[in-house]
Amino acid sequence: MTLTKHEQDILLKELGPHVDTPAHIVETGLGAYHALFTAHPQYIIHFSRLEGHTIENVMQSEGIKHYARTLTEAIVHMLKEISNDAEVKKIAAQYGKDHTSRKVTKDEFMSGEPIFTKYFQNLVKDAEGKAAVEKFLKHVFPMMAAEI
């Protein structure tokens, strides 16, 4: 189920301060990946730019900044386009295909959804916004996973 315009507006407003500058975009993505790798450090090996890193040093690597930026940009792009189902599917498909070269299984990919949901909910203060985060990620994650 997709977001209503009202839910989209809440999320864009609440996430705005976290994605308003290139530095904030990277910082937001770093937080999401920190949450993912804390829960699943074994996933680090799936990222070519993180080769040789461990949970102890991955967050200081240059490679993680690339992944942090692209994750946040993809989420914001899908959120902004949520009323355009064809565009969201296109973005989700590309993001999902990007994971095929990482040898990520659908189950591994989907295991990130509750982690990212919790992380992004912590960035949102409004209870309605927290529910919208969950609704949004539960909508787009399966679309991305379908391409893996």
From Swiss-Prot:
Taxonomic source organism: Paramphistomum epiclitum
Role this protein plays: Oxygen binding protein.
UniProt keywords, alphabetically: Heme, Iron, Metal-binding, Oxygen transport, Transport
A Pfam family assignment: Globin
Family of the protein in this entry: Belongs to the globin family.
Extra remark beyond the main annotation: This globin lacks one of the heme-binding histidine residues found in most other globins (replaced by a tyrosine) but has an extreme oxygen-avidity and high oxidation resistance despite this change.
Tree of life domain: Eukaryota
UniProt-recorded Gene Ontology molecular function terms: heme binding; iron ion binding; oxygen binding; oxygen carrier activity
Name of the protein: Globin-3
